[in-house]
Amino acid sequence: MAALTNDTAYFHALTRLWDNLVSKKLYITGGMGSRAQGEGFGPNYELQNHTAYCETCAAIANVYWNYRMFLATGDSKYVDVLERALYNGVISGVSLSGDKFFYDNPLESMGEHERQRWFGCACCPGNVTRFMASVPSYAYATQQNDIYVNLYIQGKAEMQTADNKVTLEQTTEYPWNGKVTIKVTPEKEGKFAIRLRIPGWTKAAPVASDLYAYTDAAKKYTLKVNGSATRGAEGDGYETIVRTWKAGDVIELEMPMDVRRIKANDKVEVDRGMVALERGPIMFCLEGKDQPDSIVFNKFIPNDTPIVASYDANLLNGVMVLKGTAKEVEKDGTVKDVAFKAIPYSTWNNRGADQMEVWIPESKEYATPTPEPTIASKAQTFTIQAAIQKDAPESAAVMSYAWGVNDQWEPKRSSDTSKPYFYWWLKNGTVESLAYEFDKPYTVSKVEVYWLDFDHYDGDFRVPQSWTLYYNC
């Protein structure tokens, strides 16, 4: 509407929303929406990893929105966010087999997350399938006699400029390799501009804000036309080559794809002391199946650790993997060297449910040794939830698994929602129950409850007026 009506007030509002998202509420995967409650946002810098919502549909919407913002401005910063969401936050929502889906896309898991074939509210599966068919339309754009090359994807495209019809044919192994060759074939010899997007991942910051930053300096890309080094005018994130093009002209763009470490703004509490690994536009994660002890949370990767990238054609339909030597913290506090392997975040949970993390500790103090099992952690937990509707019969009550109450993650405070927590949704002034079922009789000497204290627009969660413990003996 802002573009069609040339309404600057609307566009200023859009820009303020975009700036707030990208500087304070965007996940490094391009996902957005930290809260399941309301499927929405929390306060600035609330970017929980384990409890992140990051709905698949929201990542798709992030692509749509940023594409429209690009069309209205011609600024590549919007395509940088689009690409980040596309290669990480969107395709993580669908299995490699194409028939299972994530509704939410957390950046950390203890193994409780797994893609499903369908959902009661099945917006994501249909949205993914229609979105995949639209991906080629985001690769190029034209304005008068300018051609914008936004995404580097092998293939051929025909486009109409103001004065010519032009075919561009890309040859590339992107996103695994940063070398791109573009054959230019205009219908007639003529002068026009080809604007090549230089991705944000080749620069000092993943996105156009101080929310995330690389810990190292980027290596410079190289650009050639017909084998000769060239430099075009730089602006809005593009390098623009203006010349008289003829059939058979070839552009070669080579962007070094080193493994880069990313740090979050210190205001993102959950990511302090953590590092994320990226290569090109691809975010990586640790998954339990690739680690010697099948555990990810007890490891840390010091900032001087060498990390090597290699292509594994036999893993997950063929992916780039990162390998190196991490430090593992044992139960007694000792530290030992262990090999680690990281895979693209988008491909996790294609070999069954498992532990996973995107943000990896850099030092011992942020790693979590695997605790010894306790009486509570070995129990089955469940709750009997009455129907939300008033005057519903008792038969409408549902017994379900109670998550987050005995997983041995200790909250920092009652408002800490960074790890799984349990709550009764839309219940206020009611009597609710939660039960532990043990495999055998135990002697229990003490019971404590860490109560949730959490504000949300559709309901606040507070310490109960009273609580009582019942037990069978």
Predicted regions: what is each one?
Residues 1-3, 12, 51-70, 125-135, ...:
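Well-ordered alpha-helical segments within folded domains of soluble proteins
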Residues 4, 13-27, 84-92:
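Alpha-helical scaffold segments in carbohydrate-active enzymes
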Residues 14, 80-88, 93-185, 203-225, ...:
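C-terminal beta-rich recognition modules with glycine/proline-rich loops and embedded aromatic residues
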Residues 31-55, 98-122, 420:
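Carbohydrate-binding/catalytic loop surfaces
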Residues 194, 221-223, 467-469:
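Short beta-strand elements bearing conserved aromatic residues within extracellular beta-rich modules
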Residues 372, 415-473:
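Aromatic, loop-rich ligand-recognition surfaces of beta-strand-rich domains
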